[in-house]
Amino acid sequence: MSRRRVIQRRPIPPDPKYNSRLVTMIVRRIMRHGKKSVAYNIVYDAFKAIEERTDSDPLELFEKAVRNLTPLVEVKARRVGGATYQVPMEVRSDRGTTLALRWLVQYSRSRGGKTMAMKLANELMDAANETGSAIRKREETHKMAEANKAFAHYRY
């Protein structure tokens, strides 16, 4: 692994319907076995369900949900002289968004419901209202960081 320079990240293209990079990111997280069109259908159906239920713009609700889910701090394991400490670290914005989308998809999948689109729609609406499993995960992460504040000086 070369240590010479930082690798340029590939730009994420916006999705065709909403022209949003965030939508493309969640489609890529939902996609399984390379079936991107299926993933797009799931996301668009979820957005349609949100629009029918709330009579508001689904993209705004989605962005609000992701903002609510984005963690500010997380803990990373750091080994110091035979002991492993959970060191609280600030989360970069791109990592925060990635974690938010990961939790959103993970807890949507584990949720009860008929279709993945409905499960995703329900989890998105819960996240926008600051309830639901994904929000609980973010709160848990923040609590863990707060509990291990004493080890913050081990930051690297």
UniProtKB/Swiss-Prot annotation:
Coiled coil location: none
A molecular-function term among this protein's GO annotations: rRNA binding
Keywords of the record: Ribonucleoprotein, Ribosomal protein, RNA-binding, rRNA-binding, tRNA-binding
GO terms for biological process, alphabetical: translation
Keyword RNA-binding (UniProt): yes
UniProt xrefs under SUPFAM superfamilies: Ribosomal protein S7
GO cellular component terms given for this protein: small ribosomal subunit
Keyword Lipid metabolism: no
InterPro entries reported in the protein's UniProt record: Ribosomal_uS7, Ribosomal_uS7_bac/org-type, Ribosomal_uS7_CS, Ribosomal_uS7_dom, Ribosomal_uS7_dom_sf
Biological role stated in the UniProt entry: One of the primary rRNA binding proteins, it binds directly to 16S rRNA where it nucleates assembly of the head domain of the 30S subunit. Is located at the subunit interface close to the decoding center, probably blocks exit of the E-site tRNA.
Quaternary structure annotation from Swiss-Prot or TrEMBL: Part of the 30S ribosomal subunit. Contacts proteins S9 and S11.
Homology family: Belongs to the universal ribosomal protein uS7 family.
Name of this chain's protein: Small ribosomal subunit protein uS7
Source organism of this protein record: Trichodesmium erythraeum (strain IMS101)
Gene name of the record: rpsG
